[in-house]
Amino acid sequence: MSGQSSWRRAATVMLAAGWTHSSPAGFRLLLLQRAQNQRFLPGAHVFPGGVLDAADSSPDWVRLFAPRHTPPRFGLGPEPPRQPPFPGLSHGDADPAALPDDVALRICAIRETFEEAGVLLLRPRDAPASQEPSQALSPPAGLAEWRSRVRSDPRCFLQLCAHLDCTPDIWALHDWGGWLTPYGRSLRRFDTTFLLCCLRDTPRVEPDLAEVVGYQWLSPSEATECFLSKEIWLAPPQFYEMRRLENFASLSALYRFCSDRPLEVAQKWLPIILVTSDGSVHLLPGDELYVKDSDFLEKNMSTDKKTEEIMKEGKVLNRIVIRSPYVYEIYVTLPSENKHVFPRNYIVNKSRTARL
């Protein structure tokens, strides 16, 4: 617990699938529409994912992964050094018998993708490692009943995998980064690991019609256009990541990038919200105004200046300017670091802004 906010660990997977239809973009991302009755981000379009459950870390998974994959890394490669946590943010001591975070968070993302979208990111237990984009498992008989059981009790996901003689395809999920919910957006705040999975083909999606009421497969540019035209709503982290993915022209390029990245580079960001006299700016690590201080876990920065004044003064930037609920701008002047990429600057034409 930090101040008044209760932090929960979570994982989300950006599911990128090859697109065979005639289109300049070579892949689409799965976006799920959250139900309006959800307390966190109601109605938003989000990547599949959810809160880490104790069942995701259970040592009972060890028997399922054996004998091909064994502790402590289960074939994920060397353990990467961890980014120091944001000052003042702690999740307490880990259970020494639990699975490593890298494994548990991947299982969490895969389980939640099944619960929310009906997509099974599983691999037969005896299948060798793949050097190309993965493929979702074809829906088995009795899927609806299993899905209901897993939603009621996450421990049933292990039972489902054993029933299918499969393991969660943790090796198809690549570290991408992570986001901490900024102060003020909600009393429910999340420490969310972002993972990326490339699939050769688009799998069948069946929203659960409880947490999720719809879905779309959209390219990064299509998602941006749908957001600007108010067809979908994206939270700032999802918008930033969509714009980051705009750097990749094809699924193969994205897959190569994820596969070749060093393991030690995944970073987790806490946006600090700078409230101006006429709007707000989400400051991200590397920005000249960003302050990594525990005080900002529970408060925002503020200024009497207008947003444009702040922008004119800035030189070293990594920020999202919130013009309105459906107009965000991204400004980055930092060079790419740690073998990751930044989004290109994204500025909305003023004449278009006036119409939105």
UniProtKB/Swiss-Prot annotation:
Top EC class, one word: hydrolase
Record site: Important for coenzyme A binding: R34, F40, L41, R188
Intracellular or extracellular location(s): Peroxisome
Segments carrying motif Nudix box: 97-118
Cofactor: Mg(2+); Mn(2+)
EC number: 3.6.1.-, 3.6.1.77
The entry's keywords: Hydrolase, Magnesium, Manganese, Metal-binding, Peroxisome
Protein name, per record: Acyl-coenzyme A diphosphatase NUDT19
Pro residues: bias regions: 78-87
GO BP terms: butyryl-CoA catabolic process; coenzyme A catabolic process; malonyl-CoA catabolic process; medium-chain fatty-acyl-CoA catabolic process; propionyl-CoA metabolic process; succinyl-CoA catabolic process
Family under the similarity heading: Belongs to the Nudix hydrolase family.
Lineage top rank: taxon: Eukaryota
Residue interval(s) of motif Microbody targeting signal: 354-356
Gene Ontology CC annotations of this record: mitochondrion; peroxisome
Any GO molecular function: magnesium ion binding
Signal sequence extent: none
Disordered: region residues: 72-94
Protein encoded by which gene: Nudt19
Residues bearing the modification N6-succinyllysine: K299
UniProt KW Manganese keyword: yes
SUPFAM superfamilies assigned: Nudix
Subunit: Monomer.
Protein's job: Fatty acyl-coenzyme A (CoA) diphosphatase that hydrolyzes fatty acyl-CoA to yield acyl-4'-phosphopantetheine and adenosine 3',5'-bisphosphate. Mediates the hydrolysis of a wide range of CoA esters, including choloyl-CoA and branched-chain fatty-acyl-CoA esters and at low substrate concentrations medium and long-chain fatty-acyl-CoA esters are the primary substrates. Highest activity seen with medium-chain acyl-CoA esters and higher rates of activity seen with the unsaturated acyl-CoA esters compared with the saturated esters. Exhibits decapping activity towards dpCoA-capped RNAs in vitro.
Sequence ranges assigned to domain Nudix hydrolase in this UniProt record: 10-241
Binding locations of Mg(2+): E112, E116
